[in-house]
Each structure stands twice: as structure tokens, then as C-alpha cells.
């Protein structure tokens, strides 16, 4: 059942044969404690399918959170996507804006698929999926207003209302802990033990 629909402007560009679609996302690489831009020349399709059949077409750029995205990194991404001239410059600006939006919104993931290069070398985000960290919604009032708790796990919502952090997991094993670090370590040990 649909409870809320957000509407965005439709984009039409003539000369579709001269357009090119890319994939790009910004997310946290938890293993390395760094943000990462994942990108591919194969936009407009399911990235999991690309990863399974043609993993060599997916690239990553790790970003040190202490210094943020550097200009050379954005240029390397645009170069690896095969762009040149004005399209190259526009993609560098797009990547910088995308990363700043990711950081500024306290997102855990920003995925644009496809990123469209138009026939006149403009770069557009045609479709996006964004996950905002629930724990940052107090800082992100504009996004908090868009939140639809009917789309969330009702048990997790109820726990949050009484000041508890609750994560609903698959299976039959439960874990009650008093900190995120202990929770992660305990879950890792349970998984390791089988």
C-alpha cells in the first residue's frame, strides 16, 4: 500500500542516441572506515548484475574523511569514465556536488543510476536512491519531514519512541547490549561461532 508519493521534474533530452549512462554511488566502506565512491560505465542497469557478470567494469575511489574528496580524485573518476572536454569538467563538478550532498545530508548511501551525459555534455542525476542516517535526523529537519514511519519496521519505531535502539534481525538469536561497539563485536562472535 502506498502512503506517500514524492514527485520530481521529468527530464527529456532529444538525441538519446548521443547520450551515455553511468552508475555512481557514495557510501561508507565500513571495513576501511572511509567513504567510497563506486562508479561504472554501465549505468541504467542493475549494479548487482554488473558486479556479477562484469566486475571489471566497477571502480571505486576511497576518500579519507579527514581531508574529504580531493580534486584529483574527481578528475580520476571522470577520466576512468572515458570523458573528455566539457563533459569531463561537468562530471568533475557533478562528483564534487554529489559528495558534498552525501556529507551534508548525513547520508549512509547516495546512489545515482543512471547519471546521464547528454548530447550537449551536461551531466544529470536521472534517478537516485538516498538513505539518510536515522540518528542524524535531528540535524536534518528537511529530510525528517519526508520520513514515513509506516514504511519502517513497527517494532523499531516503537523502541525508538521509548528511547531504545532496536535492530530487528533475521533468525532466532537475540542480543541485548549497552553500546554499538559491543553489539557489533557480539554479533561478529555469534556469526563466527556459527
Can you describe what each PLM-predicted range is?
Residues 1-3, 10-112, 116-194:
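ATP-dependent carboxylate/acyl-activation modules
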Amino acid at each position: 500500500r502506498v502512503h506517500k508519493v514524492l514527485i520530481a521534474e521529468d527530464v527529456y533530452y532529444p538525441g538519446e542516441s548521443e547520450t551515455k549512462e553511468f552508475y555512481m554511488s557514495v557510501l561508507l566502506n565500513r571495513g576501511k572506515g572511509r567513504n567510497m565512491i563506486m562508479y561504472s560505465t554501465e549505468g541504467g542497469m542493475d549494479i548487482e548484475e554488473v558486479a556479477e557478470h562484469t566486475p571489471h567494469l566497477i571502480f571505486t575511489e576511497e576518500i579519507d574523511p579527514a581531508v574529504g574528496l580531493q580534486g584529483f580524485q574527481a578528475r580520476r573518476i571522470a577520466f576512468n569514465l572515458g570523458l573528455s572536454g566539457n563533459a569531463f569538467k561537468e562530471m568533475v563538478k557533478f562528483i564534487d556536488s554529489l559528495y558534498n550532498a552525501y556529507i551534508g545530508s548525513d547520508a549512509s548511501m547516495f546512489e545515482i543510476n543512471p547519471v546521464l551525459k547528454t548530447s550537449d555534455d551536461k551531466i544529470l542525476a536521472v534517478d537516485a536512491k538516498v538513505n539518510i542516517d536515522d540518528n542524524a535526523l535531528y540535524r536534518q529537519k528537511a529530510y525528517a519531514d519526508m520520513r514515513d514511519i509506516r514504511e519502517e519496521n513497527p517494532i523499531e519505531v516503537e523502541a525508538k519512541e521509548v528511547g531504545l535502539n532496536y535492530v530487528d534481525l533475521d533468525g532466532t538469536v537475540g542480543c541485548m547490549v549497552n553500546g554499538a561497539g559491543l553489539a557489533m563485536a557480539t554479533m561478529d562472535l555469534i556469526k563466527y561461532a556459527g
